[in-house]
Amino acid sequence: MDTFQVIILALIQGLTEFLPISSSAHLILPAQLLGWEDQGLSFDVAVNTGSLFAVVIYFRHELWAMFKAWIASIVKGQHSDDSKLAWWIILATLPAVFFGFMAKDFIATHLRNTGVIAVTTVVFGLLLWWADKMSRHDLTIYQTGWRKALLIGFAQALALIPGTSRSGATMTAALMLGLSRDAAARFSFLMSVPVSLGAAILVGKDLAESPLPIDYQALTLGTVISFAAAYLCIHYFLKIISRMGMTPFVIYRLALGAVLCGFIFL
């Protein structure tokens, strides 16, 4: 890949990973418009790692508090709001792990195409709008509970379907269950840590066994750009939804779905 392609794809990954607008839909557009080939496994690992670093550093205080409380709940039997939240995040991760393992080959073979992504981009955009308008928005992140956490986890598993958007599906479910916009977004971001870490380990294992050459300069640049874009995205997204809700992202999803449909039918 040339430098321009690295910059564009890393920006797309960083900006769309945590917005409810589907990163897979956006990665299709440059390929369609510019005729780019697949960026390769090593680059996927690099930009995903950059996004993971961004969410870990942004929420470092919350994650550290959760980790200490989680250890205390195991070792000393001391339970607190942070330890409960940590257990809920772990519980919410399980459905995606199970269904990802069981269905990854089917999804890669049958669902990773422009038609599916166009439909899911529109349908789940409408669901996000409905959830944002109908939700009570009165529960904090510490009022999630294990039942709601598990349901949000199943929504994350549903996001294995390309175009759905992991953050979009989890935020939609959280809003439907009564969480505030800020709580829904923060729970979704925290959920991304174990999922992204697990995916990075698995894909990294495949990469280590691959005989293909690695362009370390491109990977380093992609990681740095993805990190910076994702960090800024998280910061400003939390500000936007507190003032405007999810409507701007719903409108964007509908427009993006229309563009993708144009590639199919025109």
Curated annotation (Swiss-Prot):
Its main location: membrane. Its EC number is 3.6.1.27. The chain crosses the membrane at residues 1-21, 39-59, 87-107, 114-134, 149-169, 183-203, 218-238, 246-266. Signal peptide: none annotated. It is found in: Cell inner membrane. GO terms for biological process: cell wall organization; peptidoglycan biosynthetic process; peptidoglycan metabolic process; regulation of cell shape; response to antibiotic. It is an enzyme of class 3 (hydrolase). GO terms for molecular function: undecaprenyl-diphosphatase activity. Keywords: Antibiotic resistance, Cell inner membrane, Cell membrane, Cell shape, Cell wall biogenesis/degradation, Hydrolase, Membrane, Peptidoglycan synthesis, Transmembrane, Transmembrane helix. It is a multi-pass membrane protein. One of its GO terms (cellular component) is plasma membrane. It catalyses: di-trans,octa-cis-undecaprenyl diphosphate + H2O = di-trans,octa-cis-undecaprenyl phosphate + phosphate + H(+). HAMAP family: Undec_diphosphatase. Belongs to the UppP family. PANTHER family: UNDECAPRENYL-DIPHOSPHATASE. Bacitracin is thought to be involved in the inhibition of peptidoglycan synthesis by sequestering undecaprenyl diphosphate, thereby reducing the pool of lipid carrier available. Catalyzes the dephosphorylation of undecaprenyl diphosphate (UPP). Confers resistance to bacitracin. This is Undecaprenyl-diphosphatase 1. It comes from Shewanella oneidensis (strain ATCC 700550 / JCM 31522 / CIP 106686 / LMG 19005 / NCIMB 14063 / MR-1).
